[in-house]
Regions:
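Aromatic-flanked redox-active Cys/Sec active sites in thiol-based oxidoreductases
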Residues: 64-70
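A short beta-strand-turn-helix
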Residues: 40-61
Length: 146
């Protein structure tokens, strides 16, 4: 009996770990769907000028959270570059928890599909957006609703 209880507990935790590996995290929906973008006060990545929600487009746009240290961001960046070619849908970037010089270097290597880039060096805006990890992309309407 003494061996059965620890064995059952062990099997239980291994089962949780095993099933956790197969949960598709890309299918996790944002709790902000249908809600307005949060206000923020940060800086623009390229210029260092103050940035807030008033600087964002008043039309439908993509909001892409990315970082230079994110390998998956390179693959998504290629897709964003293709989307940007016809200029029909504007893309705003949020550089997340990154070093400014690394982010600017990354954009010079891979190209810059963004009309505007918010520098979220502390992750404050990402936290307000409920970011699980980078990259994440939100479709935002003209009323700034996700």
């Amino acid at each position: 009996m003494k061996i059965k209880i620890p064995l059952i507990i062990f099997i239980f935790f291994i089962s949780i770990l095993f099933f956790g590996l197969f949960i598709e995290t890309k299918l996790i929906q944002s709790p902000l769907i249908g809600k307005k973008l949060p206000n923020y006060e940060l800086v623009e990545l390229n210029t260092g000028y103050k940035s807030d929600i008033r600087m964002l487009p008043r039309e439908t746009f993509l909001l892409n959270i990315w970082a230079s240290w994110c390998l998956e961001c390179i693959r998504e960046h290629n897709t964003l570059t293709i989307i940007n070619e016809d200029k029909k849908l504007k893309i705003v970037g949020v550089n997340y928890k990154d070093k400014r010089e690394d982010a600017l270097g990354w954009l010079s290597i891979y190209g810059n599909p963004y009309i505007y880039n918010i520098y979220d060096y502390t992750g404050e805006l990402g936290l307000d957006l409920g970011v699980y990890g980078v990259p994440e992309t939100f479709l935002v309407d003209k009323n700034r609703v996700i």
